[in-house]
Amino acid sequence: MKLRRSMLFVPGSNAAMLSNSFIYKPDSIMFDLEDAVALKEKDSARLLVAHALQHPLYKEIETVVRVNPLDSEFGLLDLNSVVRAGVDVVRMPKTESAQDVLDMDHAITEIEKACGREAGSTKMLAAIESPLGITQANQIAFASKRLIGIALGAEDYVRNLKTERSPEGIELLFARCSILQAARAAGIQAFDTVYSNANNEEGFLKEAALIKQLGFDGKSLINPRQIELLHNLFAPTQKDVEQAKRIIEAAVEAERQGAGVVSLNGKMIDAPIIDRAKLVLERAKSGIREE
């Protein structure tokens, strides 16, 4: 499964950022045609994003576009433009049901047919931003083979709860756990919401550590400075890597000997621990954490 620790939001109407945001090296670039774009700039932003998607340097990084809802006047126009331009992943906003996913899947299928793009090559990411969506997270996660993951959109969700975001994020715990459980059950990835105070590095790291501990695959970002911080947090330490190698070596040796039980230093090593060691080694390919 592709490494997607960081998804950097880039406003679709910001020509300067569109021209060079690949230099920050997030795992995915997410061009935004929805909330970050004023109504009067929707059409020009769509053209800018379509042009950026065809830039050779954006072929070397995964591209995601958050389109406007299909039931808006801009949604289908956005979708037609970005699918034809070769976007890797379409981010659905405000997903509240499996039917929302199916409708988007069908629309993408028709566009792929019309432009000659390989069927199924356009992937989807469903953003859940309401209490209704959270209650339907499991159905949403299983709704389409195009889905690479589901993501939490906190601002609308918290407003609908009739509360506000706190430094501790306690108001998001149920939503985060619901999204994570649904994603894991469906075998797809789970992504956390943005941390909106770009100047609060300590607060960002605290929240990022929390979602990593919960089990999230990555996080949406609004500031390039957050990318390195997040990648370093998700990276294993050298000590982690060395222990993971010992676990894998013990498992390989046990299999070679036909032993039914894997042990290391007198302790039994079961399948979940071996799987965790494999994940550590996979993450280590992208860097070792600075301690």
From Swiss-Prot:
Cofactor: how and how many bound: Binds 1 Mg(2+) ion per subunit.
Q: What is its EC number?
A: 4.1.3.6, 4.1.3.34
The question of whether Lyase is a record keyword is answered with: yes
Enzyme class, spelled out: lyase
Q: Which GO terms describe its molecular function?
A: citrate (pro-3S)-lyase activity; citryl-CoA lyase activity; magnesium ion binding
Q: Which reaction does it catalyse?
A: citrate = oxaloacetate + acetate; (3S)-citryl-CoA = oxaloacetate + acetyl-CoA
What GO terms fall under cellular component here? ATP-independent citrate lyase complex; cytoplasm
- List UniProt keywords, sorted A-Z: Cytoplasm, Lyase, Magnesium, Metal-binding
One family from Pfam that matches here is: HpcH_HpaI
Where in the cell does this protein reside? Cytoplasm
Q: Where does substrate bind?
A: R66, E129
Its assembly, as annotated, is: Oligomer with a subunit composition of (alpha,beta,gamma)6.
- What's the family? Belongs to the HpcH/HpaI aldolase family. Citrate lyase beta subunit subfamily.
* Protein's name in the database: Citrate lyase subunit beta
Species: Haemophilus influenzae (strain ATCC 51907 / DSM 11121 / KW20 / Rd)
Gene name tied to this protein: citE
